[in-house]
Amino acid sequence: MAKPTEIPGLEPGTPLSVAGPLLVRARLDDVRRYEAAAVGTGEGEPDVDAVHDMRIASRRLRAALQLFGRGDLAALEDEVKALQDALGEVRDGQVQRRWFERHARKQDGGGRLAAWAGGGLPRASKRLRRAIRGWQGAVAPSIARAAEDAAGKGRLQGKRLAKEVRARLATLKRRLAAARDARSPRKVHRLRIAAKKLRYVAELVEPGFPGAAKGMLAALVPLQERLGDLHDTDVRIERLERLARRGQRRERRAARATLAVLHEERAREARALRRELSRWREERVVRALRRGFSRGGRRVKLRVKVAAAANGHAADAPAA
């Protein structure tokens, strides 16, 4: 996953009236970087990596609009969400097809399932090309013009941004508790979304809270990896269960055989997630992270042992 563009000169004392427009423009440029590759050539399928990176960049742009947007700029977030959704439709199809292609080597019928998983990609790719044309023609230029409105009172290390981070942490804490047994795909997915949103905000406020934000990003890496693995498996199970009921005879047989493998895989991934959630509770990770954004925004050294560091993870690990 590509890192967000760094902006030289931003520091804890930088006014939001300066930092806000710079961060919004940087996040906008990050999205635009992938336009050509994500459109593809002719009627062909878009580049897999470009779709992935552009989707993440669009999420980061939405986070910037939520944090700094006002007036017309804030209203453009829905347009960015529409682009993100079009990218997500293609990305999900590509991810699922790739898994079934690999699985096809191990089990009869896997090739048939790979074709089924990628069956919607031509239509999704067409919708994505249409969405990118709209983005290029109207949405991106509008964000560029309105970026100057991304202001607000205070500094990068001020109370306002610290409060925003604490609010995201509170949401994460609630969803950690709700998903603690890792049984419900819906609750796991909601936790995954909360972790993503917290990550993208932490990236934005890192120049103001460098120590606290780096600790937060590192702590989120192993959690997001476990959540991502389990979510992808849950999506496969849901779709295959539907195919096992409604597909053609050979498809139903292949789907049932693959479902047995997937349920075993989900059990392993759920155990791994439960271990990570248990670690967060035992080490009071949320409480430790919150301290870095408390006391009026002053830096506080985190006392949490970050598993990401112990396992050799980097804070920029995939968070798709």
Name these PLM-found stretches.
Residues M1-A320:
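Function-determining surface determinants
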